[in-house]
């Protein structure tokens, strides 16, 4: 992973968890070839462990094949919530939790 290729290492992305793609606004240029071109997604794997889906891949410079960052995305269902996480030097860090119920109990207003 290369901190010289990104504007900010592991930026806080709130609840934006990317299963695929790249956060190009954070990409400065490749530190090895000094070009700012497309970022390839390579070495993508998808595994499932104990009900948790884990997707990993590398962000790579199109021109010189320098590895810019390693991306990890996880998805799981815990109780009545879908849990998402993302950790990547380029795309950032994020967490999200979405209720599987029609009405999210956390969003309901108290009656009294």
Swiss-Prot record:
Keywords: Activator, Developmental protein, Metal-binding, Transcription, Transcription regulation, Zinc. Transcriptional activator that mediates FGF signaling during neural development. Plays a role in the regulation of cell movement. Does not bind DNA by itself. It holds the Pfam family Churchill. Zn(2+) 3 binds at residues 59, 71, 88, 91. Belongs to the Churchill family. This is Protein Churchill. One of its GO terms (biological process) is positive regulation of DNA-templated transcription. Zn(2+) 2 binds at residues 30, 33, 61, 64. One of its GO terms (molecular function) is zinc ion binding. Zn(2+) 1 binds at residues 2, 5, 30, 66.
């Amino acid at each position: 992973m290369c901190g010289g290729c990104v504007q900010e290492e592991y930026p806080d992305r709130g609840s934006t968890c990317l299963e695929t793609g790249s956060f190009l606004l954070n990409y400065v240029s490749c530190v090895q070839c000094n070009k700012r071109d497309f970022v390839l997604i390579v070495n993508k794997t998808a595994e499932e462990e104990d009900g948790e889906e884990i997707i990993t891949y590398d962000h790579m410079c199109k021109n010189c094949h320098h590895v810019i960052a390693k991306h990890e995305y996880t998805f799981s269902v815990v109780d009545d919530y879908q849990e998402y996480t993302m950790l990547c030097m380029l795309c950032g860090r994020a967490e999200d939790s979405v209720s599987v119920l029609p009405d999210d109990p956390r969003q309901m207003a108290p009656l009294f």
